[in-house]
Amino acid sequence: MYSDRRHTRKRQRLLVVGVFLVLLLLALAGVLFALSNSSDSAKKETDNASNKEAKADKKDSSGNSGGEPGKKNNGAKKSESDKSGSNVKLGDKPEAVKGIYMSAYTVGGNLDAYLDFTDSTEINAMVIDVKDVTGEVMYPSEVPLANEIGATREVLPDLKTLTKQLDDRGVYSIARIAVFEDDILPRERPDLAPTDSSTGEPWLNDAGQAWSDGYNKKVWEYNVAIAKEAAEAGFDEVQFDYIRFPSDGPLDTLEYKKTPFPNDQTALGEFLKYADKELEPTGARIAADVFGLAATEDGAGVGQYMNKLAPHLDVVNPMTYPSHYPIGSFGYDNPNAQPYEMVRESMKDFEEDTEKVNPDIEIRPWIQDFDLGDPPYGPAEIQAQMQAVYDSNETGWLLWNPSNVYTEGALKPADSNEPTTAEETTTQ
């Protein structure tokens, strides 16, 4: 009996020791697992940091630091906190976007020369026609309606190839899409166009150009589908032009089939709201071209009210060409002779109009690099407009010349370290 109890106690002690050893081994295994995860996590963080640095180096071919607004600067991103409530796009972009307009035909035939131009000057962005006011879609789009109406062309190379070319050279890519002025869609699909009440045919402006119906959601879907193709192909930004209602022509005979919104500005705002939602997954920024007087004259008569448009935009592009302002604008008899004043006064109004509805919006104006009226425009007039932008606490601008011939003498060289902010410069 005593021997049995002794063997029982021995077995109990062995069991306790065995359990202790098992627990000890499990604890050691847990420590080793934690150390392994910590090492892997640290390695991933190091690899991610290295990848980000490599990407930044690729985008910043000029070698400038992140805070310098020089050429090809990767720059700061917009705040992740968008006070307007819409999603902010977080793709790489230069600290200061300084771009030129490029027709699809120029890109299709002479892109390399313009890429060299960006290498030698402060230009770091291109605005490229993807769909223009003729209604032509400048690449072989897969959007069904574009093919149904015969709008597609093969002017541009494959969009993915094009955006890779631009990205490899550190050029920020912007796809320009003319929305409601469109000479193909209304003629092929009159049900998607306003009607001329005197003829029963699609309404035409003074230039004989047709317009699509800005109230019609099928028209919205068509243009946004093209925008999505461009964004998914790699364009950094989508710029909607002719995001307005007609301004010239026999407006008294202009009739819409349905007007499901209380006014034109609400329709435009709802279009941009829809575009913002559809494009959000692509990460592309959304921009819109507007009249230079849109903020000064409450929509400029075409529905471009900033309180409706700005909440759904990352960028607004006022077309502040001094030659386009009517006599007497801001008190000047010859606006074309006041390049600084026209841009500066317009920028003030846009800042005031957007502050309450989207204080984070970038105001990046189109400025004039062409001759129309007196005086002709050279480096001094172009630089005066740029200075007006800097004095408005903005850093980016876009040069417009319909022939894509730009005044190199107005531009800084690519390696220039000259200041371009209001705090560091003086007004001309």
Regions found by a protein language model. Give the residues of each.
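Glycine-rich, aromatic-flanked loop segments that form ligand/cofactor-binding clefts
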Residues: 125-127, 157-202, 239
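Aromatic- and acidic-residue-enriched segments that line the glycan-binding/catalytic groove
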Residues: 138-149, 182-204, 248-259
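Aromatic-lined carbohydrate-binding/catalytic grooves of carbohydrate-active enzymes
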Residues: 121-155, 247
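Substrate-binding cleft of secreted/luminal carbohydrate-active enzymes
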Residues: 36-37, 313-327, 336-344, 349-428
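N-terminal Lys/Arg-rich, disordered targeting/topogenic segments
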Residues: 1-14
